[in-house]
UniProtKB/Swiss-Prot annotation:
It comes from Staphylococcus aureus (strain MRSA252). PROSITE patterns: RIBOSOMAL_L1. Pfam families: Ribosomal_L1 (PF00687). Keywords: Repressor, Ribonucleoprotein, Ribosomal protein, RNA-binding, rRNA-binding, Translation regulation, tRNA-binding. Binds directly to 23S rRNA. The L1 stalk is quite mobile in the ribosome, and is involved in E site tRNA release. Transmembrane segments: none annotated. NCBIfam families: rplA_bact (TIGR01169). Belongs to the universal ribosomal protein uL1 family. GO terms for molecular function: rRNA binding; structural constituent of ribosome; tRNA binding. Part of the 50S ribosomal subunit. HAMAP family: Ribosomal_uL1_B. GO terms for cellular component: large ribosomal subunit. This is Large ribosomal subunit protein uL1. InterPro entries: Ribosom_uL1_bac-type (IPR005878), Ribosomal_uL1 (IPR002143), Ribosomal_uL1-like (IPR023674), Ribosomal_uL1/biogenesis (IPR028364), Ribosomal_uL1_3-a/b-sand (IPR016095), Ribosomal_uL1_CS (IPR023673). The gene is rplA.
Length: 229
């Protein structure tokens, strides 16, 4: 494994790896130890006490963070009829039908989120092998397969983030940028944590929030005291 640079080592030395910090302390420390020369993202990782091999312990959804993520999301909407005008009025970057299926099949990916009306999923389904591995396939659980394209687009533009538990039960999500105030990041963190707490499967036993850490792009991880959640 490659050795981390001097700048990273200096930042990491400010974090006590044996200590678990409060949410407030962890966010402040993560910002202070950011070493990127750009406005880095602030990311959180929740390790949940779930078994993702069981169908009733799958966790996936989306939440609108009160302060957004600081990132502008480009939205592609698959729709037809009057839903095209509705999506455009809501601020969608690209709206169309089969022509966008063909563009994507040819390697076009100038978008961050895909929304589709249910009557377009027959066409969008052709892109499963392409969009699926990139996490871009529309899904009812995340509100991206819907007839209410206005609400879907507006929420994404307002700072909606999708979350999904990976094989080890880990949920990764961005809660903002280093330029955000501590209060904005804390509020976003609490919103996400609350949604995950409510999503706890009834069949999940033992400790639910096994570990939580916050980090910035390229920065060291800071552990959060799960007892404080």
């Amino acid at each position: 494994m490659a050795k981390k640079g001097k700048k990273y080592q200096e930042a990491a030395s400010k974090v006590d790896r044996t200590q678990h910090y409060s949410v407030e302390e962890a966010i402040k420390l993560a910002k202070e130890t950011s070493i990127a020369n750009f406005d880095a993202s602030v990311e959180v990782a929740f390790r949940l006490g779930i078994d993702t091999r069981k169908n009733d312990q799958q966790i996936r959804g989306a939440v609108v963070l009160p302060n957004g993520t600081g990132k502008s999301q480009s939205v592609l909407v698959f729709a037809k009829g009057d839903k095209i005008a509705e999506a455009e009025a809501a601020g969608a970057d690209y709206v169309g039908e089969a022509e966008y299926v063909q563009k994507i099949q040819q390697g076009w990916f100038d978008f961050d989120v895909v929304v589709a009306t249910p009557d377009m999923m027959g066409e969008v389904g052709k892109l499963g092998r392409v969009l699926g591995p990139k996490g871009l396939m529309p899904n009812p659980k995340t509100g991206t397969v819907t007839m209410d394209v206005k609400k879907a687009v507006e929420e994404i533009k307002a700072g909606k983030v999708e979350y999904r538990a990976e094989k080890a039960g880990i949920v990764h999500a961005s809660i903002g940028k280093v330029s955000f105030t501590d209060e904005q990041l804390i509020e976003n963190f609490n919103t996400l944590q609350d949604v995950l707490a409510k999503a706890k499967p009834s069949s999940a036993k033992g400790t639910y929030f096994k570990s939580v850490a916050v980090t910035t792009t390229m920065g060291p991880g800071v552990k959060i005291d799960t007892a404080s959640l």
